[in-house]
Amino acid sequence: LDAPTIRAIVERALEGAAELVARPVRATVEPGENAILRVTLERPVPRAAEVVPDRARVTVRDDSGTPVFTGTVDLVGPREMRSGLVAVRADKALPPGLYHARVETPDAPWRPRSVTTGFWVRDAALLASGPRLTVSRDWIRRDGKVVPVIGTTYMASDVHRKFLFEPNPHVWDRDFADMRREGINLVRTGLWTAWSRIMLDPGAVDESFLSALDAYVLTAAKNGIPVCFNFYAFLPPAYGDENPYLGPRALEGQRALLTLVASRYRGVSWIHWDLINEPSYAPPSGVWSNLPIGDRHEAEAWRAWVKAKHGDDPLVLRDLWRDGSSDPLGVPRPDEIGYRFLRDERHPRKVRDFFEFTQDVVAAWAARLRGILREAAGSDTLVTLGQDEGGTGTRPAQQILADSLDYTAIHTWWNNDDLLWDGVVTKVPEKPDLHQETGLMSLEDIDGAPWRTPRSAEALLERKFADAFAARGAGVVEWAWNVNPYQPEDNEATIGFNRPDGTAKPERDVAGRFARFFAEAAPFLDDFEPDPVVLVIPHSRLFAGRPAGVDSTKRVVRLLGERYGVVPTALSELRLGAERLRAARLVIVPTPEMVTEDAARALLEASRRGTKVLVTGEVEGDPYGRPTPSLEALGLLAEGRPVTLHEPTGWGVPPGGRAWVTFDSLATQWLKRAPGESVRLDGNVWHEPLPLELAVETEPLVALLGAALEAAGVATNPAPAGVAARLLVAPRGVLAVCVNETPVDARRRMRVEGRAVDIPVPAQRSRLLLFERGTGRVLVATPGEPVTDARRGGP
């Protein structure tokens, strides 16, 4: 900083605390209605001889800068705080549009002496001008055209999460214009935990909030950016009831809030809806987990669910769940959740069913609220639910929720080792998956210094963006546009593109690069061809509390992407059907341990159509340990044994040779292998006896996957470890995505439209390229060295 700047900073500090605030009483007024502004001047510790202003000057201009009102406002009150209201009475009714009000106290002996706020005169034509948002298998579409989302989360850069209670449309318009210039094409915002501030009692909604939301939507529309609005966070409000998902009073209150808000925007396609942020099924004390709530509504719903699934014969249920208690139909106790070496009084098979029950409860709740929103806002309004990575575990899962939503969403925060997997297991083939709240938590070293440099943070965010598209995602919504310095938690108080001083982090460049790439690529994109490989998520194993849960799927996704340039479609075992497997050449079922009869039947039907099915590890039966007809027909049932620390395998060595794999982390105490030697890939059902996905060594699993891909006739792009890659084929273009997780620059070889090319990928960065169908010519590419022909070495 130069000397004058430092001097100005010191002088301002010596002036002491002072604040001039101006806000509209209602941020949106109707045509012909006068806007009212409240001006507040605070001087917490006035100096003895100084004169605190008792009047402020107000100038209102339209959006072109033309003055439409000038006046003054009397400020009354003690010297420490004075306030007043001014009505904007123009010579004639103000036409629809955004207006900017500058408030000045020029005689104040301190700074700031001026502030600018804004308000809207409702513009019905602008609200009605929105694009028609729809969804297809892979994309969110705008008036029918593919729009890869490059979005952000935005509340406000001045008051942040208080933005709908302390509105300033002038600031919003400045920030939205900045976003538009950067290429942002969707903004996510909402209430999160502030729902109680707008409606404590069902039906009694705060009109000032609605007026502010009108202004926010109008400002977004003025800048051509659609809004996704979130209602709740973590748990829905119970409104005095016992269960937020099942209680009638809870559902009544939720219906009232959603109806009162959404009906205001009937026919307004600039806004659509996100039901709840990162939900759990749990009591308030158990957020971020999946636990019984313990109320009567839950008990009744559980009994009805069990009766529909198994009947209500206590003898049958005792046998099914190994439950000898006096109340086999009772909800599992919280202390039954989780794995232990000794079963004690726990009933893991019953817990497995309870977890499936909670998934169904939340999915039904989401479907109910989606129906309410469609009745209120219109049948074509889009509805999603922003779940975090807990949806890949036992919390409400995107794979199960998908039928209740228009598109799924995943918040990619913590799983930095498995970012591609995050997207794969949360995307269903029928609907788009949007990566929301993609950002970086803070990390510190032993002395509290930042773990990442600004440039390494930028590189990680770039990999997150690229992995979203590699996972067939519909786009990325970054968290958040502005750093929120008011956050009391250090972990969150530094997240965002733009710092409180107005400067931008290098991370912001990521959004611009991807926005520019997809602006050129979008006309060539459409829904992609189905993936030839399907990965089955063993949800029964996860819900039964088995160690390592679905970790086997992480290893498969990483190795397929890095070593073979193949990324699978993932399907939940609980939603597996033969029709969903119709396009698959290869179905991988990694270490399932137990498989429902419905899923086994789908696998059997697929195998009889010619699809190859690869299953690893022991399969004991269905989730209740019973043999089933389809498992018998697949030839998967055979009594196995616990793995030993070292097991022999024929994979990864020459024919007739033997390698050894290691099962550590006490796997010898909870993991079994099937009998027999390494599988021969004959027929259509292949059962590898070893759960190789959970072994320490990688190469045997790489060899097994490679042999399975070859036998199934799946095209691959083999490469050493470290750079994940895939090709996504649309009718007019082929999207290539490469992500380098190594510290060295690399060249990833891919065969595109018959042309072998080497794609340069910088260390810890990514490359996206769009190739023309038929010719393999590069149409668009993210910045980097040129692609070269692998045979000739030329561009």
Question: PLM features: residue spans?
Answer:
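N-terminal carbohydrate-binding accessory modules
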Residues: A108-L186, F524
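Polysaccharide-binding and catalytic clefts of secreted carbohydrate-active enzymes
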Residues: G267-Q398, D422
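Aromatic-lined substrate-binding rim segments of carbohydrate-active enzymes
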Residues: V171-Y239, P248-L260, A366-A376, M594
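A conserved amphipathic helix/loop scaffold
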Residues: L1-V25, A457, T591-P795
